[in-house]
């Protein structure tokens, strides 16, 4: 069996190190930096010939820089005769444009990035909670999309929730919320129906379900500016919710996210470590982080050993 080696770019060094620790190994020796004009510079400083290589790199902000680091690392390792290269992308950026809406003159950037990664020599992709699961079909290589929900659910079960109800922040998240509700002792579910007049601006319209006097658990795949989340929490409190907890896998926290969350009625925001948090976000008492390192390490081990990934999520 080829030697398994882990490498990492500069996007999520802490998570990459945690994964390496879980696998009782060290991160590979590669210098990932910049030339004087800002271009990405990569040099692999150890033998990888025939190796089973995993590159851990989220394509979060700065998105273009982190994406280029990933593809240049892939090319460097491919030219160094790596046996198999798996791109471990905990947060897959450029995933929001996955279709053309009403024949608008817009790109399908998720497909562009998928083609880009395939063309430079990625043999397989491991990612977490893709914004749209159909993105897996954009790749010409195998994609394993694992879920952060078991980690989030474990935390929910440890909380002393009083008469909980799981809330989907929009219609698109109903499947996710229903799955969480079933595993959270088969609790009830509510849905927030909202309209989005323009990008990153949402308006809460209607709550489907009775939340009065209950602990509400909002679940989503990502938190961007936090505008949707905060308005949802406000609407839930207005309808009599006792406490509001928000759970999401990907903590993007862009724009006015810090102020939005700081001034919101949300009791706690729980996220995973797929994206590094800014110092301002870390300073918020409302925000708490869970690590996906154990789950990612197990997925990497299974891929390397040609074992089932889906078996990780069978209940």
Swiss-Prot record:
- Record GO cellular component, one term: ribose phosphate diphosphokinase complex
Residues annotated as binding Mg(2+) 2 are 170
Protein name from the UniProt record: Ribose-phosphate pyrophosphokinase
- Cofactor binding summary note: Binds 2 Mg(2+) ions per subunit.
Q: What does this protein do?
A: Involved in the biosynthesis of the central metabolite phospho-alpha-D-ribosyl-1-pyrophosphate (PRPP) via the transfer of pyrophosphoryl group from ATP to 1-hydroxyl of ribose-5-phosphate (Rib-5-P).
The record's PANTHER family line, in alphabetical order, gives: RIBOSE-PHOSPHATE DIPHOSPHOKINASE FAMILY MEMBER, RIBOSE-PHOSPHATE PYROPHOSPHOKINASE 1, CHLOROPLASTIC
Question: What is the uppermost EC class here?
Answer: transferase
> Per UniProt, where does Mg(2+) 1 bind?
131
Pathway field of the UniProt record reads: Metabolic intermediate biosynthesis; 5-phospho-alpha-D-ribose 1-diphosphate biosynthesis; 5-phospho-alpha-D-ribose 1-diphosphate from D-ribose 5-phosphate (route I): step 1/1
Q: Where is the active site?
A: 194
Residues holding ATP: 37-39, 96-97
So which cofactors does this thing need? Mg(2+)
One record GO biological process: purine nucleotide biosynthetic process
Q: Which organism is it from?
A: Photorhabdus laumondii subsp. laumondii (strain DSM 15139 / CIP 105565 / TT01)
Which CDD domains is this protein grouped with? PRTases_typeI (cd06223)
* UniProt KW keywords: ATP-binding, Cytoplasm, Kinase, Magnesium, Metal-binding, Nucleotide biosynthesis, Nucleotide-binding, Transferase
> What subcellular compartments does it reside in?
Cytoplasm
Which Gene3D superfamilies does the record match to this protein? 3.40.50.2020
Family affiliation: Belongs to the ribose-phosphate pyrophosphokinase family. Class I subfamily.
Is ATP-binding found in the keyword set?
A: yes
